[in-house]
A protein has these predicted regions:
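Short beta-strand and strand-turn-strand segments in soluble, beta-rich domains
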Residues: 107-116
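Mature N-terminal, pre-catalytic/accessory segment of carbohydrate-active enzymes
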Residues: 138-144
Length: 144
């Protein structure tokens, strides 16, 4: 959908001996394979802001294979609680995710999965994001 543009000093991704610093937090973020998958999804649809309270946005991006990416983006200086309901998002004609009784969530940063009826409420740290790839638990890949 868009190139990933870095505005930081990439030399800081290296240790003094010239090897890659795999513990560098910024490098781990920009090289996260699932985040790159969201950015380069073949559906090619941009994200939209679906909800905001002024400090915390809920950003939604339809993905190929009837999946959905949701980003909770806290622009504030204190932790904010952000909430959304996948079932309500699935009502939006912009969203390709089918309605379901249960949804499978992949937390992109934590690399963990959970199943929910679609209602999500999360504490998002200051100047932080939570990022999910969501699909119907009824139609999840690999027979899950």
């Amino acid at each position: 959908s868009a190139p990933l543009i870095l505005g930081n000093d990439i030399r800081k991704f290296l240790k003094e001996d010239g090897s890659v610093d795999k513990n560098n937090e910024t490098l781990r973020i920009v090289s996260n394979k699932k985040a790159i998958e969201i950015d380069s999804d073949p559906l090619g649809v941009q994200c939209r802001r679906e909800k905001t309270n002024g400090l915390c946005d809920v950003l939604v991006k339809p993905l190929s294979d009837n999946r959905l990416a949701v980003c909770l983006f806290n622009k504030g200086c204190v932790t904010q609680t952000a909430s959304f309901n996948v079932t309500e998002l699935a009502d939006n004609e912009y969203v390709t995710l089918p309605k379901s009784h249960r949804y499978k969530f992949l937390d992109v940063w934590e690399n963990c999965e959970f199943v929910s009826d679609g209602a999500v409420s999360e504490a998002v740290g200051k100047h932080a994001v939570k990022l999910y790839i969501i699909e119907s638990a009824d139609t999840a890949k690999n027979g899950e």
